[in-house]
Swiss-Prot record:
Keyword Transmembrane helix: yes
Record keywords, A-Z: Cell cycle, Cell division, Cell inner membrane, Cell membrane, Coiled coil, Membrane, Transmembrane, Transmembrane helix
Name of the protein in question: Cell division protein FtsB
UniProt-annotated location(s): Cell inner membrane
Transmembrane segments: 4-21
Lipid bilayer topology: Single-pass type II membrane protein
Family named by the database record: Belongs to the FtsB family.
Lineage, highest ranks first: Bacteria, Pseudomonadati, Pseudomonadota, Gammaproteobacteria, Enterobacterales
Pfam families according to UniProt: DivIC (PF04977)
GO cellular component, one term: cell septum
Record bears the keyword Cell wall biogenesis/degradation: no
Length: 105
């Protein structure tokens, strides 16, 4: 009976070692779960970006309004006959520019 008990204890110890510290053990499971969570977060961000780009493509394919808005905002274009007015904030509201210095060395 003593040899069987010793054999079962050794087998139990080996199984516990492989469960906690061995390949595909608990440490690997925790690492893989954190990797999966990080990848799912990255996938969600990329999906949101893709959805935004697809919506922009649909807007651009849908008509001239989106193209006109984009050309006005990004390129500063205006229609023929329009007058462009630029509103400049007051000096106190603008960020002060860095003073230009010259080194006379």
């Amino acid at each position: 009976m003593g040899k069987l008990t010793l054999l079962l204890l050794v087998l139990l110890g080996w199984l516990q070692y492989s469960l906690w510290l061995g390949k595909n053990g608990v440490h690997d499971l925790v690492r893989v779960e954190s990797d999966v969570a990080a990848q799912q977060s990255n996938n969600a961000q990329l999906k949101a970006r893709n959805d935004q780009l697809f919506a922009e493509i649909d807007d651009l394919n849908g008509g001239q309004g989106a193209i006109e808005e984009r050309s006005r905002n990004e390129l500063g274009m205006i229609k023929p006959g329009e007058t462009f007015y630029r509103l400049v904030p007051e000096q106190s509201k603008r960020q002060p520019a860095a003073p230009a210095t010259q080194d006379n060395q």
